[in-house]
Amino acid sequence: DPGCLPDWSSYKGHCYKVFKKVGTWEDAEKFCVENSGHLASIDSKEEADFVTKLASQTLTKFVYDAWIGLRDESKTQQCSPQWTDGSSVVYENVDEPTKCFGLDVHTEYRTWTDLPCGEKNPFICKSRLPH
């Protein structure tokens, strides 16, 4: 595509690539930054359709979700920090709070799903079109 590196795809001034190597959300973001981009942000239905198509074409026969650049930055759990009986939370047994988002393999990458950030998945990088 004009302006993008070989095997990257262009859409409205940005370049995209789906990487099959798997990593945690942090690993994936770091890798994208090293390749002059970030994990993909998705700002419209049209862009979502473009990224979905790219992911489903690249990740055929894959059983993984695919990381995008969305993460819940809040440090607290999404739900209110209190038991239903009113007692406060003094003990937690949570593997890892679910705070990172990926495209869901079960819907052929059409919908977003929240996942533990430490899960290892392929990912989609997005960078600005070099001028």
UniProtKB/Swiss-Prot annotation:
Q: What does this protein do?
A: Snaclec that binds to von Willebrand factor (VWF) and induces its interaction with GPIbalpha (GP1BA) (via the vWF A1 domain), resulting in platelet aggregation.
GO MF, one annotated term: toxin activity
Q: Which UniProt keywords apply?
A: Disulfide bond, Hemostasis impairing toxin, Platelet aggregation activating toxin, Secreted, Toxin
Disulfide pattern: 4-15, 32-125, 100-117
Similarity-based family = Belongs to the snaclec family.
User: Subunit details for this protein?
Assistant: Heterodimer of subunits alpha and beta; disulfide-linked.
Cross-referenced PANTHER family: MANNOSE, PHOSPHOLIPASE, LECTIN RECEPTOR RELATED
Q: Where's the C-type lectin domain?
A: 11-126
- The protein's name in its UniProt record: Snaclec bitiscetin subunit alpha
Can you list the GO cellular component terms from the UniProt entry?
Answer: extracellular region
Under the heading SUPFAM superfamilies, the entry gives:
C-type lectin-like
> Where does this one sit in the cell?
Secreted
Read off the Gene3D superfamilies from this record: Mannose-Binding Protein A, subunit A
- InterPro entries to which the protein is assigned, alphabetical: C-type_lectin-like, C-type_lectin-like/link_sf, C-type_lectin/snaclec_domain, CTDL_fold
Expression across tissues is: Expressed by the venom gland.
